[in-house]
């Protein structure tokens, strides 16, 4: 049986990775939905590369965008299953894991995967 602390276990992920993921997904969203508003010439080497992708592979970018969100949904659902398997029974903790994994994907899920619940010794 899980301890009370284990049943409510939640750990926020790394601010570094959350920032990287947020900026990357934000840029990806901008590229997919508003490519005409991107100042390609001001982005250094990223500008011409992004413009090439938009001009020649926009359908692939769109499909990849929705696939990335679909993967995040799958990771989030797996996080719920993993919570139950690891003895995290608190609805609030499970919701936090679901949301964090939905928005930040593998950066969150790896924390949950690494979690080892402490087993109580039977006397």
Curated annotation (Swiss-Prot):
Cellular component GO terms, alphabetical: membrane
Residues recorded with modification N-acetylalanine: 2
Keywords, ordered alphabetically: Acetylation, Membrane, Transmembrane, Transmembrane helix
Record InterPro entries: TMEM254 (IPR028110)
Keyword Cell membrane attached: no
A Pfam short name: TMEM254
Entry's transmembrane regions: 15-35, 61-81, 95-115
Membrane topology: Multi-pass membrane protein
Keyword Acetylation: yes
Coiled coil feature spans: none
Cell compartments where the protein resides: Membrane
Protein name stated in the entry: Transmembrane protein 254
Origin species: Homo sapiens (Human)
